[in-house]
Regions:
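A helix-centric hydrophobic-segment signal that preferentially recognizes long
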Residues: 2-183
Length: 183
């Protein structure tokens, strides 16, 4: 009889532990979704700013129409992979706008264009901060998922490692080609 009671208590404690770990993993997933929404908000704001930059640039560079049709309509991504693609697409359009603007000095000196460039810089900082938060949350759940015994619960619940938001490499250069001669 004591063995049966002991077994029931053990199974009950095991079930409570399993539910507790499962709930903790679910909370991590919710936290990741919440922090990813911040990234989506920044991407929408950034999209709107890029659209405004395109309007200003169109006024100066009417014959550069092919550039202006490349703005991808994606404003936010449902998954982390889609968000990475949206960020890449927006960065590509920004690079094209900057390339076109170099051909039009009057565009570069436009107060509206300069204000939009500053706004993009601010939004890039907001995006970087939001990405750090998402990646920190992703790191927490991924560490939990690969740690025993939580990995058992994650496996049973079908929870897999979550991908990180990609770090931007655009604008980062190899320093080996710099001239270090001080003379």
């Amino acid at each position: 009889m004591n063995l049966i009671i002991g077994l029931i208590i053990f199974v009950g404690l095991l079930a409570i532990w399993f539910i507790s770990v499962g709930n903790r993993l679910n909370r991590y997933l919710v936290t990741i979704e919440e922090s990813k929404r911040t990234v989506d908000i920044v991407l929408v704001k950034r999209y709107d700013t890029i659209s405004e930059m395109l309007k200003v640039a169109k006024a100066y560079a009417k014959h550069e129409q092919d550039l202006f049709t490349d703005l991808v309509a994606l404003r936010q991504g449902a998954t982390i992979q889609e968000s990475n693609q949206v960020i890449t697409n927006q960065n590509d359009v920004l690079a094209q706008i900057r390339a076109v603007s170099e051909n039009y000095p009057e565009l570069l000196s436009s107060n509206q264009f300069l204000a939009l460039q500053k706004e993009i810089a601010d939004e890039n900082e907001d995006l970087a901060a939001a990405k750090r938060i998402v990646n920190s949350n992703v790191s927490h759940i991924n560490q939990e998922i690969v740690s025993f015994p939580a990995s058992i619960v994650a496996g049973v619940k079908g929870i897999h490692q979550v991908p990180f938001l990609a770090e931007e490499t655009q604008g980062k250069k190899d320093l080996s080609d710099l001239n270090y001669d001080l003379n």
